[in-house]
Amino acid sequence: MINKIYKSVLITGASSGIGLETLKRFFNENIIIYALDKDVSKLEKLKRKHKFNIIQMNLFDTDEIYNKLSNLKIDIIICNAGIGRGAEGILKASREDIEVSTKLNVESYLHTLKAIVPWMIKRRKGHVVLMGSLAGLYPQISSVYGGQKGAIHRIAQSLRIELSGSRVKVSEICPGRTKTNFGKSAFKNKDKAKKFMSGFTLLEPRDIADAIMFSLSVRWRSNISTIEISGTEQSPGGVPIIPVKDPILS
């Protein structure tokens, strides 16, 4: 159960994966729910059985973010929306891959926070939850996606300092490989996508939702800053050492 001081929550990327699983957790809480996504067809079906508000929005549209979110009175913002385009690295990513993924994975987070956090400061309560990644904490062969999630890590850390004394909390959730649609958007080659999402038991969206809800459950004096969550069979941090074949020496 989340801390009772929170009366409203906004979840971005709420129609699938981690966002959808997190949304479902709030159905058991006494809280006003706002579920945001570009495609709301799944949310419309879910709303037939559960009470919550749907916000249809394209997070690539900065003006729309401010127009629709600035007047909302939100106690918890869960910035979860994201895309894996460009995850194969800067050499394989197209210019469009880089622009699109940076817009959603980094810029939309900043604009969403800019629109909502002032209300939290005014009320002297609130909780910001940012979806990071192990790719943002440990070097991997993913300079585009890893760089973007590295930016989220620094944003989370710096925002905590910026909000010091406001009683607004900031938590970053950093999952390892999770059974979502990430692989499909990250790799143009279906076989590579399948290989990326195999080889060991992946995390599931409910595992990440557990971590999010835990960060929201602690007493007001506690702030869960960063949660790293990886599969039991996944050990982040190590990278393979690949000898360079120098044509001059061979």
Residue ranges and their predicted role:
Residues 158-168:
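Active-site-adjacent segment of SDR/Rossmann-fold oxidoreductases
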Residues 172-173, 192-238, 242:
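C-terminal helical subdomain
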Residues 91-110, 125, 129, 152:
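Catalytic Tyr-X3-Lys loop
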Residues 113, 148-149:
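Active-site helix of classical SDR
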Residues 15-16:
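Conserved glycine-rich cofactor-binding loop
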Residues 133:
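Residue(s) in the substrate-gating loop at a strand-loop-helix junction
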Residues 93, 139-147, 158:
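Active-site loop-to-helix junction immediately N-terminal to the catalytic Tyr of the SDR YXXXK motif
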Residues 104-122, 161:
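Amphipathic alpha-helical dimer-interface segment in Rossmann-like NAD(P)H-dependent oxidoreductases
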